Amino acid sequence: IIWYNSCLAMLFWFEYYFFIGFDGLTGGKGVMVQGDHFHTKEEALAYCKRVLTEHPSVIIDERLEGEEFSLQCLCDGKTVVATPPVQDHKRRFVDDKGPNTGGMGSYSCEDHALPFMTQKEVTEGLVITQKVAEAIHKETGEYYKGVMYGGFIITKSGVKLLEYNARFGDPEAMNILPLLKTDFVDVCKAIIDGTLHTLNMDFEKKATVCKYAVPKGYGLPKDHPDAQSTSAKIEIGNVGAARLYYASVDKREDGLYMSTSRAIGVVGIADTLSEAERIAEKAIAVIKGPVDHRPD
């Protein structure tokens, strides 16, 4: 009764769209958005109940409208350095339709911005991250050292923070780390030693596109006709200039098998975004088996 009344009060408090999410880690698949994943207050309450069977609390908050971007920063406790921004596409199907996933693909541009943003928004994200790093030290007395991967959204009222992860993004790391010209060991050492401010991190001026090859049943509800199509054998042909990053796969005596999650990250790197996309799309087409991907 208590949870029902509390959730009901929050749901009726929102005049416009809102979202419901887990108060915890769910691999990027726990958020449901009004208008996309549910439409009525009854459906919203049903999802709240489901969340509360797995977690002690549920998040109900305003839905923000805008373009999202990922900014993976490195921090030595005092200095925060941003890597080129990336846009991740979490929805399972073309045109950003269907359920959220851990990420079906991502891209970055050769100018180290994105088509809908400038360096101004990158700087705003970096400033927010710097303030968070300072707040961590102020509140805990400890210097945070490592990756601060922020999810941001550009709204009509400016750049807003959605979340932080203390790790690289998946798939966003596959867009950025191949472009890093500075020795990554030197970067890690500078983070440990607190000397990141002395290191000039350099990235190639290249565009990247990452597309995930996934089982046909990946991310689908149990009642979907393809939901049971998960683990299966796959064969990989000539991928040309693309890079492959193996994820949820199992090498057996008779070949390579997908498991139930994202199988292979296929990355194209080129001077332009369109060429990088062409490389990735051509390569993912030679992965044979019951696989799916986002051709867009």
Report residues per predicted region.
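A conserved helix-loop-beta module that forms one wall/lid of the active-site cleft
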Residues: 1-30, 35
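Internal nucleotide-binding/catalytic subdomain
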Residues: 30-173
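Active-site "cap" helix and flanking loop/linker of ATP-utilizing ligase/carboxylase catalytic domains
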Residues: 123-149, 165-241
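Short beta-strand/turn micro-motifs at beta-sheet edges
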Residues: 93-96, 198-200, 249-256
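Short, conserved charged micro-motifs
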Residues: 40-43, 220-222, 271-278
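Generic long, charged, amphipathic alpha-helical segments
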Residues: 227-265
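Generic C-terminus detector
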Residues: 258-296
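Short beta-strand-to-loop capping motifs
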Residues: 35-36, 73-75, 213-215, 268-270
